[in-house]
Regions:
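Conserved beta-strand elements of the Class I
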Residues: 1-3, 79, 112-114
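N-terminal Rossmann NAD(P)H-binding glycine-rich loop of SDR-like oxidoreductase domains
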Residues: 1-21
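Rossmann-fold NAD(P)-dependent oxidoreductase module
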Residues: 13-17, 104, 181
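NAD(P)H-binding glycine-rich loop region in Rossmannoid oxidoreductase-like domains
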Residues: 30-73, 83-89
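Active-site beta-alpha turn of Rossmann-fold NAD(P)-dependent dehydrogenases/reductases
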Residues: 44, 79-83, 115-117, 169
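Catalytic helix-loop patch of NAD(P)-dependent Rossmann-fold dehydrogenases
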Residues: 57-65, 83-122
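NAD(P)-dependent short-chain dehydrogenase/reductase
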Residues: 106-154, 160
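Mid/C-terminal beta-alpha module of Rossmann-like enzyme folds, strongest
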Residues: 158-220
Length: 220
């Protein structure tokens, strides 16, 4: 028996691959304990950083709801799709709350933590690639940031990993290089005085060239 927790973009990709018996979200997760599961795939809570930072208590409550329900549920294996922010920005509400869920996963005898960076996918609704494609919020892009990326269509290659913890990341890519390559018309309109986030998690699973090819596919 297979369960998936989550209803976001990553969860939808997991569902397509593992074909779960049941899918749970915040409204029906109390039913999780009604069944003994072989594997629970957790792609929750929401990956919306802005919402999590604006609603830290609600975000924290969502995390603890997952932990508390899993604590009274029988299962053999737990696979958590987490965020690189737990390593790079653990002092933010978003990073701290997801780190709490990682810490729970680490207490389990059979678990994997798969940390994902910024995502490339046709259905993304907010990141710098979405902003470039839709010509919105370009003035909010921080060209001083260095991010790592993952093409979510490749998730199937990682779902069945046996690593206890793994960062699924590309080589670090400076945001201004992405702007220069794909939106050169705004390169001189950006604010270069702000300090940017610097992501450099290892190992690197994808090269800069592979990521640029995925970005090009997304934008064109």
């Amino acid at each position: 028996m297979i369960a998936v927790i989550g209803n976001g973009l990553v969860a939808q990709q997991v569902i397509e691959v593992v074909k779960p018996n049941s899918v749970f979200n915040s409204s029906n997760i109390p039913e999780l304990s009604n069944t003994a599961w072989d594997t629970i795939y957790c792609a929750a809570p929401s990956g919306n950083r802005i919402w999590a930072q604006q609603n830290p208590n609600a975000d924290r409550s969502n995390v603890w709801q997952i932990i508390n329900e899993c604590a009274v549920t029988k299962f053999r294996r737990f696979v958590l799709f987490s965020s690189g922010d737990t390593q790079v920005k653990p002092n933010t509400d978003y990073g701290r709350n997801r780190l709490q869920l990682e810490n729970y996963a680490k207490t389990l005898p059979d678990s994997s933590i798969i940390r994902l960076p910024s995502l490339i996918h046709a259905s993304i609704t907010k990141n710098i690639l979405y902003d470039i494609k839709n010509n919105c919020w370009l003035d909010k892009i921080n060209p001083q940031s260095t991010l790592q990326w993952f093409d979510l269509t490749c998730l199937q290659s990682w779902i069945y990993t046996q690593h206890r913890e793994i960062n699924v990341c590309s080589e670090p890519i400076e945001t201004q290089d992405i702007i220069r390559e794909f939106a050169p018309h705004v390169i001189n309109e950006l604010d270069y005085t702000r300090q940017g986030d610097k992501y450099n998690l290892s190992p690197y699973s994808y090269t800069r060239e592979e990521i640029f090819a995925s970005i090009k596919d997304y934008l064109t």
